[in-house]
């Protein structure tokens, strides 16, 4: 993201504690930076230690610049190592975070199998790979939500954003486990929005198309595939991670205070609204 790029300001996000799973790279990292710019306290969970350190160093640089310009530094993201495929780690990290921070105002369930590893045809899927995709893409989403919602309820509300995909709505061939988990994400979002609504906890999802993260560009977005994507999209260009992250930030803010149970599509016009 260009340092000079103008970013909308959401006063309701100031001093809020935001937890982002898969927050060290791609859309998660873009979201972490945007929330830090809003003066939110950002907690990033990931297994990518080096990427997390690079993100922290980038925000430190932005913080110094912001302090020079405005007199106020940016909060520096805190990194927690967490392999979301391991439910015991999910539980222990959630407990540690609650002990250290008491309350998460905003939960971004972003961690997911990404890049080439998500592409397994039906005949190449094994019971182990099927279970792995469900642990990484869906199971942690449910159990982090389960762990953090009670404190949100006690505090009078909160916001949860689940990261989905349009893959189950287009003829996406060769990734049946992935598409199944992403369809389930919409179902979980709608179910939780009804269950948690009386507690003023909003639950929404963002459905991605092809997003030009560093990993996607390296492993998936070949010139031939990019040509196919652009042909399918209304916008004939790449969708950038920060463009997705801006929608996440809006949904997390009080500007979306009446929005819950919704799935926002950010796909350059590939399939449009659900």
Regions found by a protein language model. Name each.
Residues 2-9, 114, 170, 249, ...:
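Short C-terminal tail/terminal secondary-structure segment
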Residues 118-122, 126-134, 229:
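Substrate-binding pocket helix/loop in short-chain dehydrogenase/reductase
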Residues 165:
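Residue(s) in the substrate-gating loop at a strand-loop-helix junction
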Residues 150, 194-198, 257:
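Alpha-helical segment proximal to the catalytic Tyr-Lys
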Residues 145, 181, 189:
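Active-site helix of classical SDR
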Residues 142, 157, 237-266, 271:
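C-terminal substrate-recognition "lid" of short-chain dehydrogenase/reductases
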Residues 8-43:
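Canonical Rossmann dinucleotide-binding motif of NAD(H)/NADP(H)-dependent dehydrogenases/reductases
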């Amino acid at each position: 993201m260009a340092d000079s790029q103008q970013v909308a300001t959401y006063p309701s996000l100031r001093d809020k504690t935001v937890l982002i799973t898969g927050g060290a790279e791609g859309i998660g990292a873009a979201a972490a930076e945007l929330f830090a710019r809003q003066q939110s306290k950002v907690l990033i969970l990931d297994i990518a230690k080096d990427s997390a350190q690079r993100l922290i160093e980038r925000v430190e640089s932005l913080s110094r610049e912001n302090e020079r310009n405005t007199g106020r530094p940016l909060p520096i993201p805190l990194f927690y190592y967490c392999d979301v495929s391991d439910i015991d780690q999910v539980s222990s990290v959630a407990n540690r975070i609650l002990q250290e921070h008491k309350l998460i105002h905003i939960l971004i369930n972003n961690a997911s199998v990404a890049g080439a590893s998500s592409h397994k045809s039906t005949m190449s899927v094994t019971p182990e790979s099927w279970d792995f995709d469900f642990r990484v893409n869906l199971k942690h989403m449910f159990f982090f939500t389960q762990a953090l919602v009670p404190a949100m309820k006690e505090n009078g509300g909160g916001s949860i954003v689940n990261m989905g995909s349009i893959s189950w709505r287009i003829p996406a061939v060769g990734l049946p486990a992935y598409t199944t988990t992403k369809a389930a994400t919409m179902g979980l979002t709608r179910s939780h929005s009804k269950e948690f609504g009386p507690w003023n906890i909003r639950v929404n999802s963002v459905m991605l198309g092809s997003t030009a993260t560093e990993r996607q560009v390296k492993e998936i977005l070949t010139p031939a595939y990019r040509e196919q994507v652009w042909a399918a999209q209304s916008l004939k260009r790449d969708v950038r991670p920060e463009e997705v992250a801006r929608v996440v930030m809006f949904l997390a803010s009080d500007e979306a205070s009446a929005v819950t149970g919704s799935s926002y599509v950010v796909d350059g016009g590939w399939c449009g609204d659900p």
